[in-house]
Amino acid sequence: MELPKPQTVQQLSDKLTVPVEDLLLPCRFCNSFLTYIELREFDYKNLQLIWTQEDFVFACCSSCAYASAQYECQQFYELTVFGREIEQVEQQTIGLIVIRCQYCLKCLDLIEKLDICCSHQAFHKVRGNWKGRCRHCKAIE
């Protein structure tokens, strides 16, 4: 039985017994190698490594993550709800709804979700998935 492939940068580092700072992980979209900061951001955003059938592994650099998020919002936008309306639409509490940042693709934590709800800001449904603004992108906007 084949062992599951690592899904995070840290898991890949552990499996290969190579420090994260020594990993050379290419971006799936632009083929540039991710910097150390981007490798750490990749896991912080709760993104998953991309494996090919030939067992090549790829990640996504920050620039391509922003570009991909923007493209998805422009091409696959479905609807917008404000604040707690998302719970009515999804029939779930906010803590159980998976929401990613509409700009950088970071998976939002509960505090970020509640902040959007309490300030009655927008959640957007894009390609069947919910998007909002993370604390980092909110701070620079």
From Swiss-Prot:
GO terms assigned for molecular function: DNA binding; zinc ion binding
Keywords assigned by UniProt, alphabetized: Activator, DNA-binding, Early protein, Host cytoplasm, Host nucleus, Host-virus interaction, Inhibition of host innate immune response by virus, Metal-binding, Modulation of host cell apoptosis by virus, Transcription, Transcription regulation, Viral immunoevasion, Zinc, Zinc-finger
InterPro entries, per database record: E6 (IPR001334), E6_sf (IPR038575)
Location in or out of the cell: Host cytoplasm; Host nucleus
Protein origin, superkingdom: Viruses
Recorded GO CC terms: host cell cytoplasm; host cell nucleus
Matches recorded under Gene3D superfamilies: E6 early regulatory protein
ZnF unnamed: positions: 27-64, 101-137
Chief site of localization: host cell
GO BP term (any one): symbiont-mediated suppression of host type I interferon-mediated signaling pathway
UniProt family annotation: Belongs to the papillomaviridae E6 protein family.
Subunit description: Forms homodimers. Interacts with ubiquitin-protein ligase UBE3A/E6-AP; this interaction stimulates UBE3A ubiquitin activity. Interacts with host BAK1.
Biological function: Plays a major role in the induction and maintenance of cellular transformation. E6 associates with host UBE3A/E6-AP ubiquitin-protein ligase and modulates its activity. Protects host keratinocytes from apoptosis by mediating the degradation of host BAK1. May also inhibit host immune response.
Name of this chain's protein: Protein E6
Native source species: Human papillomavirus 38
Upper taxonomic lineage: Viruses, Monodnaviria, Shotokuvirae, Cossaviricota, Papovaviricetes
